[in-house]
Amino acid sequence: MRVKICGITNLRDALHAVECGADALGFVFYNESPRYITPKDAKRIIDQLPPFVERVGLFVNEGVETIDTVCRYSDISLAQIHFDVDEESLDAISLKTLPVVRARTAEDVHRFPDRYRLVDAYCEAYGGSGKRLNLEWFDGVDCSRIILAGGLTPDNVNEVKQYGFYGVDVSSGVESVKGKKDLQKVERFLRNAKSL
C-alpha cells in the first residue's frame, strides 16, 4: 500500500518520512491551515528530496492559473484539489490532479469512479482534522483507485488493508503538534502500512 505523509513543513520531517519509506509528501498551500507552507519554503525542501518521491501540493479554492504557477515554481508533481470541482476544471490544470472527495455518506465514495481520488471524512476544515470515515462504506467497493485519509494512525492503519486501497494519507495521526511530525509515529505508521 502506498503512503503519503501530508502537512510537511520542514526538511527534517520530509527526509525522515522518505527514509522510512513514504511514497509521497504533501505540502499544504492553504494559508488558513496550521500546516501551511509557502511555495518558496516548499521548493527549498523539494530541491533536497531524492528522486522517485511524489511531491503533492494541496490546494483549497484556488484557480487553475494559481495552481499551475505554484506547482511549476515549487516542482510539485501532483495537485491535490481539496474543494468541489468538476471533471472539466480538473482537466484544465496542466499537471496530474487528485480530486478529494469529502464524504458525508456512503454514496460519496463513488464520486470520480474513473479517476484516482482521495476520500476523506467531511468536516468544515480542509484536512488534518483526525476525523475518521465509516469503513463499512467501502464494503464491496473497488478501492484500487482510492487513497484513504481521515483519522488514520499507526495503531489503526492495519484495519484498512482488507479493502485494497491504492494508498493511505496521514497528517495529524503522525504529529507531535500541528505542523510538526513525531518521528517515531511516522516510522511506525509506515512500517505498519507497508507490512503484509
UniProtKB/Swiss-Prot annotation:
Pathway where this protein functions: Amino-acid biosynthesis; L-tryptophan biosynthesis; L-tryptophan from chorismate: step 3/5
Annotated keywords: Amino-acid biosynthesis, Aromatic amino acid biosynthesis, Isomerase, Tryptophan biosynthesis
E.C. code: 5.3.1.24
Tagged with keyword Transmembrane: no
One GO term (biological process): L-tryptophan biosynthetic process
Similarity field: Belongs to the TrpF family.
Name of protein: N-(5'-phosphoribosyl)anthranilate isomerase
Organism this protein belongs to: Sulfurovum sp. (strain NBC37-1)
